[in-house]
Amino acid sequence: MGLPWYRVHTVVLNDPGRLISVHIMHTALVAGWAGSMTLYELAVFDPSDPVLDPMWRQGMFVIPFMTRLGIKDSWSGWNITGETVINPGIWSYEGVAVAHIVFSGLCFLAAIWHWVYWDLDIFCDERTGKRCLDLPKVFGIHLFLSGVACFGFGAFHVTGLYGPGIWVSDPYGLTGKIQPVDPAWGAEGFDPFVPGGIASHHIAAGILGILAGLFHLSVRPPQRLYVGLRMGNIETVLSSSIAAVFFAAFIVAGTMWYGSATTPVELFGPTRYQWDQGYFQQEIDRRVRAGLAENLSLSEAWSKIPEKLAFYDYIGNNPAKGGLFRAGAMDNGDGIAVGWLGHPIFKDKEGNELFVRRMPTFFETFPVVLVDKEGIVKADVPFRRAESKYSVEQVGVTVEFYGGGLDRVSFGDPAIVKKYARRAQLGEIFELDRATLKSDGVFRSSPRGWFTFGHATFALLFFSGHIWHGARTLFRDVFAGIDSDLDDRIEFGAFQKLGDPTTKRQVV
């Protein structure tokens, strides 16, 4: 046929059988990738430390999505919370992966069958004997079936009526677990951080989809609308389908990057805004103050801070810190976190507490500055020692740790104090193992960053595709070169290929 590579899809025009075939093959590829990628991730995933080396630090991509839907067990005898599992069954990581691979194989065979047996009677119009698809009816069928699936997910799976529920956690990502969720039908259901909205919105959208599907199955579009929206053209279907996909991609890119109940911190890592706003730092400070109010010592108050919460308050877990084009997991960058060293409290020689100014997200280097409680600079690590006025040595800064591995250990050596001041720029201080993975010390992004980048990029591409194909189908006659002064009223290209010379033209 001599088609260029970017027009090979022309072969499925006016060929419903092979159009179905290529769609089934696409489903086979998607399901096969999902199953295969899951098995690969399971082969390299280390579940031994869910607190300091969670899935998102290891660069897992599909495992977090499976976990948020209620899968937590592995055939290898572990589950995502670190417990031992005896008989995980089919509802496990490997079970679902194998099911996807088997489904992929069946779709592959079905695609071949439909490619070979493409000219089926069901695709022929009884009136004309030509191949065609009743696209409004196909739309109604798809809408109805997707509505049933949407309603079923919200009403049964999420609520736990017939299913495990979904991953639900507290606002600070500490107590997450899989549990049933009651639908939230009030205004709180529109809060993106309320899990109940997931159930209620799927139920509502499912009911709407079912009703809309039944409507489109039972009511035919008026001729003026059918012609005006080019409902008989398969490229119209392509354009509107691309619109649905790019719209969904933009939505999920937003919920992933800004955070929501569908993207828990425990599964995808913190958002950049939680670092920018000092979200976890404020919660840690609140807990310490509460401990001191209960007459606990500083050491006791800081020792009660969960290591998980302290780890979130570390810039290395900020997805915007890694750069989009540094390949690999977070562990390949700054290393595998081994333990929390504790919270450093800096003081000058008069005993006044000093606070290290934290590094903003988009800085690779940042001056080490220590300020007092009023925000006034009291000490620093100078760039030029000859002009220094506030150096650690001159001010006599010391550091003492509370909580963690260095609890109640203090240092007065300026070199050591400066080392910990530099590390305090990055949030809470952790011991990091760079030897095991030969980590290079350069921050990486989390799966949250990769997902957002990928979906936002493809959403823009698909938006362009929607405009392109929408314009082609709406202005098909113009692009095909049909004169506006045709004598006969014809719908060009309804059954003929583009540029059919037999179409009658008569200049008035």
From Swiss-Prot:
It is a multi-pass membrane protein. It comes from the Eukaryota. One of its GO terms (cellular component) is photosystem II. One of its GO terms (biological process) is photosynthetic electron transport in photosystem II. Binds multiple chlorophylls. PSII binds additional chlorophylls, carotenoids and specific lipids. Keywords: Chlorophyll, Chloroplast, Chromophore, Membrane, Photosynthesis, Photosystem II, Plastid, Thylakoid, Transmembrane, Transmembrane helix. One of its GO terms (molecular function) is chlorophyll binding. The chain crosses the membrane at residues 21-36, 101-115, 140-156, 203-218, 237-252, 457-472. The keyword Plastid applies. InterPro entries: PS_antenna-like, PS_II_antenna-like_sf, PSII_PsbB. It is found in: Plastid, Chloroplast thylakoid membrane. PSII is composed of 1 copy each of membrane proteins PsbA, PsbB, PsbC, PsbD, PsbE, PsbF, PsbH, PsbI, PsbJ, PsbK, PsbL, PsbM, PsbT, PsbX, PsbY, PsbZ, Psb30/Ycf12, at least 3 peripheral proteins of the oxygen-evolving complex and a large number of cofactors. It forms dimeric complexes. Belongs to the PsbB/PsbC family. PsbB subfamily. One of the components of the core complex of photosystem II (PSII). It binds chlorophyll and helps catalyze the primary light-induced photochemical processes of PSII. PSII is a light-driven water:plastoquinone oxidoreductase, using light energy to abstract electrons from H(2)O, generating O(2) and a proton gradient subsequently used for ATP formation. PANTHER family: PHOTOSYSTEM II CP43 REACTION CENTER PROTEIN (PTHR33180:SF37). This is Photosystem II CP47 reaction center protein.
